[in-house]
Amino acid sequence: MVWLEQPDDFAKPWKLRRIGTHDPDALTGLNFADIDGDGDQDIITGGYSQAPRDHDGDEVTRDGHLGRLAWFANPGDPTAAWTRHDISRRKRGMFDKFLPRDMDGDGDVDFVSTRGNSAPYDGVFWLEQVRTAEPVASFERAREVDSVEMPLPTRER
């Protein structure tokens, strides 16, 4: 994922700025919001799984294309590296639409999102942001049963 910086002089080429990657997972959707509350635009992203749509089989392993949710923290400096924060990675699902809203009125941005291609788990879901002094990996699912949670790949490409 990259962004293009428009130069002040229209005769000059645009600058290509790297943000990050979901590799090996396919990036299918994104949206912008100030996720960390520092005043700049961060990016939430979703990925698309190539696993079967109707079961959590062994066809796709941790190094295959899986459904991933992550967000990238904007460093504030266009030349600095963005930091990826993984939220969830599942055997089944396509996470592609993200609406930033403060759903619980606590002053931070949450996301209403959609999930598809993972019957019977398709639908609309809410990613609630809970702020802590230090980052804490936390994902509370709303269902008792869901597609298998998968670890990150053995190596990122």
Language-model segments: residues:
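Beta-propeller-forming repeat regions
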Residues: M1-R157
